[in-house]
């Protein structure tokens, strides 16, 4: 492990893992597609991550030849991105990122804090933005377990065009979570469930809305890219 005592450098925030390299993993939550490591890459500017969603036509045809239905072949051939930051720290403090989604209502995405140890979930999940592009809204959310360990959450929609560049910020404070976009507070939640001591990391992932099937044709091609820049995280964390 590499321990960082000062505010993490941008390079540390760009260190990441992806999903789907060794087994089939999917975005789920009603979306289509499967994660593919090739769909996530750092651009030559050294500060922007491209997260691409793409229909692999060759894979679709191979699945069809193997006897898969159209819907199953499409589900398997839609390649999706995931960025799981390797820099983790206790959630307390400010986390910032910039993101621009493509102008396609076939794209669904989430940018969030996620617990370093999956066993801590739902504690540690804080959503900066979540939902389908093109609706004019996005969702902020906090997740936590109740006294019996049953997952609870507090979703709230905000009006926002996520296909434009925006700077997203969430502050995890004792008794309070505050969300801001472009320097303006858009939501404050007073809560006893702020995960101030839970180690978390940044995650961005995306899936394909099933409406993509509505435009299907024999020569159909499709590719969309989300651009993302991790900007700030609390100090004192480490690379996993």
Name each model-derived stretch.
Residues 76-93, 157-164, 194-195, 222:
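Extracellular/lumenal carbohydrate-interaction signature centered on repeated Trp-anchored short motifs
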Residues 144-167:
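Short, aromatic/His-centered strand-loop micro-motif at the edge of beta-sheets
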Residues 95-97, 164-172, 177-179:
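Short tryptophan-centered beta-strand motifs in secreted/extracellular beta-sheet-rich domains
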Residues 101-107, 117-120, 174-176:
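Extended, low-complexity, turn-rich repeat/linker tracts enriched in Gly/Pro/Ser/Thr and Asp/Glu
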Residues 1-104, 233-240:
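Low-complexity, Ser/Thr/Pro/Gly-rich disordered linker/stalk regions
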Residues 55-57, 99-101, 115, 172, ...:
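Short beta-strand segments enriched in hydrophobic/aromatic residues
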Residues 42, 112-143:
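Glycan-recognition/cleft segments
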Residues 11-24, 129, 176-227, 236:
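Aromatic sugar-binding interfaces of carbohydrate-active proteins
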């Amino acid at each position: 492990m590499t321990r960082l005592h000062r505010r993490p450098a941008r390079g540390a925030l760009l260190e990441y893992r992806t999903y789907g390299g060794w087994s089939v993993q999917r975005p789920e939550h009603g979306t289509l597609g499967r994660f593919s490591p090739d769909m996530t890459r750092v651009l030559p500017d050294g500060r922007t991550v491209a997260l691409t969603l793409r229909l692999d036509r060759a894979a679709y045809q191979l699945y069809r030849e193997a006897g898969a239905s159209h819907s199953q072949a499409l589900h398997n051939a839609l390649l999706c991105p995931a960025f799981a930051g390797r820099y983790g720290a206790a959630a307390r403090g400010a986390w910032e990122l910039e993101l621009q989604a493509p102008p396609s209502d076939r794209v669904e995405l989430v940018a969030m804090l996620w617990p370093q140890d999956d066993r801590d979930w739902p504690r540690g999940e804080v959503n900066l933005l979540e939902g389908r592009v093109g609706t004019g809204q996005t969702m902020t959310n906090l997740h936590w377990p109740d006294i019996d360990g049953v997952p609870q959450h507090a979703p709230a929609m905000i009006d926002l065009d996520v296909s434009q560049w925006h700077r997203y910020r969430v502050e995890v404070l004792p008794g309070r979570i505050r969300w801001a976009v472009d320097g303006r507070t858009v939501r404050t939640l007073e809560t006893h469930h702020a995960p101030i001591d839970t180690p978390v990391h940044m995650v961005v992932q995306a899936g394909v809305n099933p409406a993509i099937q509505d435009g299907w044709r024999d020569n159909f091609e499709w590719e969309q890219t989300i651009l993302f820049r991790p900007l700030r995280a609390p100090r004192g964390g480490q690379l996993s």
